[in-house]
A protein has these predicted regions:
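Beta1/beta-strand and adjacent pyrophosphate-binding region of the FAD-binding site
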Residues: 9-26, 42
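Aromatic pocket-lining residues of Rossmann-like dinucleotide-binding sites
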Residues: 34
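Conserved Rossmann-like nucleotide-cofactor binding loop
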Residues: 26-29, 49
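Conserved N-terminal/central alpha/beta ligand/cofactor-binding core
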Residues: 7, 49-171
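Extended, non-globular alpha-helical segments
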Residues: 2-10
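Generic, low-specificity signal for short hydrophobic/alpha-helical stretches with a mild N-terminal bias
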Residues: 2-3, 16, 43, 143
Length: 171
């Protein structure tokens, strides 16, 4: 049974197999996964609506899709910047940059049709766009292993979202 009831008053006693705190993209995915496995789920969301940061992103998601890439135009001009990056600036992310540089060099030298993309490109992009400073002035970045795991498995995530009825568009 699914309800979207917003409660103004506390309920005396409610139980579920899984309680998810937060109805953003990650919370909704966790709730959907638990429900698919047969668990009863309660989502607790302070905002009174679901979506979280996923609403402000418009649902954008980095996705490696070879079929869409093959149908697109080559993107040589977008790739040269990766060859200029230095591994020593990438800390634990450096191995992905090294592989990406090899991939880009091979692609640029080839007559391959379609847009270039790779898991390593997405990993490097996550590092570049995700690093910043904390309130104490220390450089911070995303968790490399977590980003790598998610991006290496993004096709499974893609097909899971589609199986749940999400419409995917190339942007």
């Amino acid at each position: 049974e699914q309800t979207n009831e917003i409660l103004d008053e506390p309920v005396a006693k409610t139980s579920a197999d899984v309680i998810v705190v937060g109805g953003g993209g990650a919370g909704l995915a966790a709730a959907a996964g638990a429900a698919e496995s047969g668990a009863s789920v309660i989502i607790i969301e302070a905002a009174g609506f679901t979506g979280g940061a996923a609403m402000t992103s418009g649902g954008h998601m980095a996705m490696l899709n070879e079929e869409m890439n093959a149908a697109a135009e080559r993107n040589d001009e977008d790739l040269y910047k990766y060859l200029d990056y230095q591994e020593e600036d990438f800390n634990e992310w450096a191995p992905s940059l090294t592989i990406l540089k090899q991939q880009v060099t091979q692609y640029l030298a080839s007559d391959q049709k379609g847009r270039f993309d790779s898991v390593e490109r997405m990993i490097v992009d996550h590092y570049i766009k995700g690093k910043g400073m904390d309130l104490d002035g220390n450089e911070v970045s995303q968790d490399y292993e977590l980003v790598k795991e998610a991006l290496e498995n993004n096709w499974e995530i893609f097909t899971w979202l589609q199986s749940g009825g999400m419409e995917i568009k190339d942007t």
